[in-house]
Amino acid sequence: MNTVRSEKDSMGAIDVPADKLWGAQTQRSLEHFRISTEKMPTSLIHALALTKRAAAKVNEDLDLLSEEKASAIRQAADEVLAGQHDDEFPLAIWQTGSGTQSNMNMNEVLANRASELLGGVRGMERKVHPNDDVNKSQSSNDVFPTAMHVAALLALRKQLIPQLKTLTQTLSEKSRAFADIVKIGRTHLQDATPLTLGQEISGWVAMLEHNLKHIEYSLPHVAELALGGTAVGTGLNTHPEYARRVADELAVITCAPFVTAPNKFEALATCDALVQAHGALKGLAASLMKIANDVRWLASGPRCGIGEISIPENEPGSSIMPGKVNPTQCEALTMLCCQVMGNDVAINMGGASGNFELNVFRPMVIHNFLQSVRLLADGMESFNKHCAVGIEPNRERINQLLNESLMLVTALNTHIGYDKAAEIAKKAHKEGLTLKAAALALGYLSEAEFDSWVRPEQMVGSMKAGR
């Protein structure tokens, strides 16, 4: 039995593994780009299959492709979407910057599989042609950016946004539950005036709510599809109705609000939609990193740290120190946030590059974009499940630190003035006195006045503020 078969493209014949559906151009890419281990993301491959499926349907409707071929292409695409042919897409991210080789990988696989479905064979005698049939009315220059947007929008809608909403809801519930717990505030890593634990967490909630708005604001641009622009945006070799119809078909089969891009030149020449959307993801990463850092600082200890909250103890934390437990969910979240920030730099560089009518950094851009979405979605799910839901206040420790804080003296500003209040705080700190003892020693107010004016629960504004 032959282990290879001969496939042919415009450069001539080349041997391809007999058991594989891919063809000549995929094989050339495999041989010419043996770079690292990063492969084209499966979600991008499936987005390419969705794009080819929609194109086959529209080409049939416009009488550009026979019903027999269109049906076979759609069936082959459905098999790809079902994961039956995942190992037929072996190409590296590091290939042509337009994604042409991955587009042809899909064209070849669908053409060979569709030919088999029609009773034919794979290879040069196939019944369905990768360029003339599967790629009809298309160019890699509009197919690949379309697949990028399809994969990105679906990932944001199905993976990231639900997890962001879940974490926001968890923290919102914690904010309400802890609304009456007065604690010391901290600015510049120094003691500050009081607030409630609920107010502190309400700030985290508001951050995530803003992040959601920023992400949702970016979605309409991501929903614009380049398909129909073909090589340089002019729509050469396409039917006048093709671009609109294929966007409508993709909207139907994905249940997502895809539309044809109003300007195909922008859609081909830039990655602006993904640059802007990833900027929102970077903002989310910054917020999550701040939240995770706050959580692990507030939970530091257990005896020699701040220790105002407790978080779940999920696993042993040290191979040498018995009983040690670490804030591992916070650490995982902060690490992946750093990766997302790094991805943003690469995406910005890629988006700013490319020349004239085509951006040629697309595989790198979509690889990093989809990685960021997955990291953030998985990270939020893990942090929520294994940390956030288990946050509990340590009321005794909170009260201890609150009562030891010199910054409660701020309540005296409006009664005795800033300078005298500062003198009280400095004397208390220097001599190891309580604020009350220092105030009475200086003779600036009576004990009754101090007890009436320095009341932490009255220094937090509305106890319900924020949430």
From Swiss-Prot:
InterPro entries given in the database record: Fum_hydII (IPR005677), Fumarase/histidase_N (IPR024083), Fumarase_C_C (IPR018951), Fumarate_lyase_CS (IPR020557), Fumarate_lyase_fam (IPR000362), Fumarate_lyase_N (IPR022761), L-Aspartase-like (IPR008948)
Single GO term (MF): fumarate hydratase activity
GO BP of this protein: fumarate metabolic process; malate metabolic process; tricarboxylic acid cycle
Superkingdom, natural source: Bacteria
Disulfide bonding pattern of the chain: none
Additional record remark: There are 2 substrate-binding sites: the catalytic A site, and the non-catalytic B site that may play a role in the transfer of substrate or product between the active site and the solvent. Alternatively, the B site may bind allosteric effectors.
Task performed by this protein: Involved in the TCA cycle. Catalyzes the stereospecific interconversion of fumarate to L-malate.
Quaternary assembly: Homotetramer.
Official protein name in the record: Fumarate hydratase class II
Naturally occurring in which organism (per UniProt): Shigella flexneri
